[in-house]
């Protein structure tokens, strides 16, 4: 009797599990449809792939000292810089993150890469390719499955020749393979063979940014976080860099493109996430930027009006409503 009871219970459990799986699949499919109703760039191959990178309810605060108080009497306080932030990058797409300076775009990049300051408090959930990540997991991904194109060229080691630095981003390859890969990328970005022997201080600003792009692409990552990758590049090279991101995404990878250049972003992105005051105020399809009536947030509409093709037509009142304040008050001292 016990064996039969167990068999019956197992059958009931299997039936319940099957029903739950079907319900989950239907819900997941419905959610996927909601996520993928948007249109894409003309060159996009994105057709509703799964989440490669998913951030949910991200909150970041810093423990600061009140700089207005006398030095030895300053009290600590928590300054919230990101709050309730959720964003996702699907396989095969580019998500452009735009917004005013100080809106939290670079802090998002730091959080995704697990680059946490000692005085920071970070809560929320981050998944990479379906796997929940902790700080250790994000650290292991950096430079491999997840690559950064940093905002500042100071990320280059001033004491190491450029060629060796770039090749160091693909240690899994043989020495000959690393060299061949680096030479291929250098040729792509107009960097001559002699650049490999230069030190970072011998590079122009544009050359240094191209070197950073090569570093990010060396190890064939699944997701690239590009933090302002085009300043210092002339228009042709900037377009080529973004086209490479588009090709990278079309191969089933993902790009989180953080930029102030909305025009270039709209050229290659699938979706745009608009940042203001430490969170995403609107996430919309690129096609919706063709008509401000399709944009729901006043700040997003202000960005639309400020585009050159609209004659920088943002009014003073709109600008005042849409302006983003600095996130950390007066550059307070860290704890």
Regions found by a protein language model. Give the residues of each.
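H-loop/switch region of ABC-family ATPase nucleotide-binding domains
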Residues: 259-260
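A short, proline-enriched helix->beta-strand linker immediately N-terminal to the Walker B motif
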Residues: 218-222
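Q-loop/switch helix immediately C-terminal to the Walker
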Residues: 158-171
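C-terminal boundary and immediately downstream tail of ABC-type ATPase nucleotide-binding domains
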Residues: 2-3, 36-40, 191, 291-335
